[in-house]
Amino acid sequence: KRDFIDSRANLTQLLMEECLSGFPKLPKDTFVIWTGIKNNAETVENLYKGGKTPHCSSAYDFRSWLAGHLGLTNGGMEINAACASSTVGVALATQFIAEGKYDHILVAGADTVSRFVYYGFAALKAMTEKACMPFDINRNGLSLGDGAVALFLSVKRNTDIRVAGCGVTNDANHITGPSRDGAGLAQAMRQAIEMAGLGTDAVQGFCAHGTGTRYNDTMEILAARSVFGDLQPPMFGLKGAIGHTLGAAGGIEVALSGKCLAQEIIPPTVGCKSPESPEIVLEKMPFPGKNILTSNLGFGGVNAAVLMEKLS
């Protein structure tokens, strides 16, 4: 059992090391926001049974390890906003930099599939026995995935892609279920668009949470219609390709949306064959647009959105 728990911690660290392999050396005063949320579940179970704590088990442990691994000395914090954690982390990092609290922030997190997480979603009847089919009329649940993300935000311009706007809300609808009308998510989306200084008609792409569950995807479509009206931008989801990576999901989608802007393409919504709404992207398409809105939801009614913008 101890070896199993340590192996999960090691897998999280390996994911982060691979994720950071292409990073340049970061300034020592970089503040770290850790957004991995589920890596200590087996540790809690083991302690309950009288077992020992592995060398790295809590969010604090992983954040401290990451800072030490990178030689960073400016401290940090951990966020748990469920599956919107890294999206909220990006929003908070953007706010901190705008307020002059920090010049450089690393938003990072990794989550791996565990027995605890698998059983939890299975108990909610949210898992699919087949492939994940985001926004498909025949969808029947989500698929879990391992994933890691590291996003470096700086007061200095290091790239042509920037965070232009963020929004975070909580509709307090239910401990696990999304609000059926999408009002809280729509509010977060509008906040991000307004912060970017844009009108809703200026949003050119939308990367949605798209878990593949019945209620989530319908609610997201309702939220998008509420925000965009008849001027729906191309809407796509990534979880049919990579699975639901929990606390890392939003950050991965922010990063890949930045890649979409840089490479001028939008990927297909893998797994979707019969879309519930016509704006869902089914095939890879050219995308000369200058911005993409991303959004994520988490248990407890959390809604978060980030608007990514290409400057040139």
PLM features: what roles do these ranges have?
Residues K1-E18, T35, T87-N158, A249-S312:
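Conserved beta-strand-centric core segments of catalytic alpha/beta enzyme folds
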Residues M16, L66-A67, F152, M189, ...:
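Structural element of the ATP-grasp superfamily
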Residues I175-D181, T211-F228, G247-I252, E283:
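Short glycine/threonine-rich loop-to-helix capping motif typified by GTGT followed
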Residues K1-G36, N40-A41, A188-T200, V227:
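Conserved active-site "lid/cap" helical segment
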Residues K1-N10, N39-L92, K101, V117-Y119, ...:
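Conserved catalytic cysteine-centered active-site region
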Residues G36-N39, A110-V113, A148, G165-A172, ...:
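Glycine-rich beta-alpha junction loops
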